[in-house]
Each structure stands twice: as C-alpha cells, then as structure tokens.
Amino acid sequence: MARYTGPVTRKSRRLRVDLVGGDNSFERRPYPPGQAGRARIKESEYLLQLQEKQKAKYTYGVLEKQFRRYYAEANRRPGKTGDNLVILLESRLDNVVYRAGLARTRRQARQLVSHGHFTVNGKKVNVPSFKVSQYDIIDVREKSRSMLWFEEAQEALVDTIVPAWLQVVPSTLRILVHQLPERAQIDIPLQEQLIVELYSK
C-alpha cells in the first residue's frame, strides 16, 4: 500500500506539530522550513483547514485517497463526523501497536505490522490499516517474540502508560482492546471540525 516515506521532521515543521512524538529536531526549530520560516504569515480559512487535514494524514501515515475513504465512512456513521474520523484513524492496527508501546513511532509500528509480526484473534494480519474492534486480542507472533526489538519492548512495557481503552500484558506481549476510544481519550492536537468544513464545501 502506498504511503508517505519522506522526511517527517520537515512535515512537522511545516504543520507546526510534532508528527512523530519526541522529535528533537522539531523541538529545536518548531517554525516552518525555509529562510522566511520564522516570519508570521497570515493564514486564510482554507489554509487552516488544509493544514489540519495534512496534520491528520501525516500523523497516521495515510495518503489522500485512503483519507477520503475514512472521511466518507465517518460521514455515514451516526454522531459527529469529526469525532468518527479521528476514532477510525485511531482504531488502525498500526496505531494500536504504537499506542500499546510495542513501537516507538507509528511509522515503525506500520513496518512491524507489514512484516507480519502480529495476529488478531489468532489470525495473522499484515495490513497496517486493519480496523480493530472491541474485544479484539492482538498478539506478537510466537516466532517473532525472540527478536531483539520485542525483547527490549517487553522490558520497557513495565513503565509504559497506555490509553484506558487498551490493556497490555507485558509477559505475553498481548494487547487487549477493551473498547474503541472516545474522542476525549485521543490526545492528538487536531481540530477535526476544520477537516469537516473543508470536505463539506
């Protein structure tokens, strides 16, 4: 599946938000790239809406065509379209692996899932965009548990704080999805209503 593989820090600076988490380069230079990066530019309503969409896309590693599908599904569901959109993105398997502390970044989580290191309810899943459901059980495949990365992650899980809607069992590298997240439980700096306004035009 196509995905953005370019420099994430540059995108973080352009959108003025840390898309990776703990990006030291962004912390040092949180202004847009380029010689005039520090100058304050008057932003139009459209530009603000576009920036929020780009922020969501790059945070979750989703390209435009797939993002439109997420929006269409969010719009069909009952409730607030913006909330639905963020919850759908947050429910991706690669994001759940990241939130559970089994990857340092969403990009790394996407790679681990793509390489077939996880099962969902006992079945191998190598699609990062796979949507988890309430009561799903996600495991690291037995033959993958001896990998150095998972051994190190297992030790770090003791001190890892995971979202309330997830539970991680460090001894078995198991992730339990107790429920799908509510918007208030998702700590990303995103104004999703601006995305709704953009697509509603």
UniProtKB/Swiss-Prot annotation:
The question of whether Translocase is a record keyword is answered with no
Keywords of the record? Ribonucleoprotein, Ribosomal protein, RNA-binding, rRNA-binding
Could you state one GO cellular component term attached to this entry? small ribosomal subunit
Task: List, alphabetically, the CDD domains matched.
Answer: S4 (cd00165)
> Pfam families of this UniProt entry?
Ribosomal_S4, S4
Set out the biological process GO terms recorded for this chain's protein: ribosomal small subunit biogenesis; translation
Q: Which residues form a coiled coil?
A: none
Q: Which GO terms describe its molecular function?
A: rRNA binding; structural constituent of ribosome
Q: Name all S4 RNA-binding domain ranges.
A: 91-151
* UniProt key word Lipid metabolism: no
Quote the function comment for this protein.
One of the primary rRNA binding proteins, it binds directly to 16S rRNA where it nucleates assembly of the body of the 30S subunit. With S5 and S12 plays an important role in translational accuracy.
Q: How does it assemble?
A: Part of the 30S ribosomal subunit. Contacts protein S5. The interaction surface between S4 and S5 is involved in control of translational fidelity.
**Which family, according to the similarity comment?**
Belongs to the universal ribosomal protein uS4 family.
The name this protein goes by in its record: Small ribosomal subunit protein uS4
Species source reads Corynebacterium jeikeium (strain K411)
Q: What is the lineage of its organism?
A: Bacteria, Bacillati, Actinomycetota, Actinomycetes, Mycobacteriales
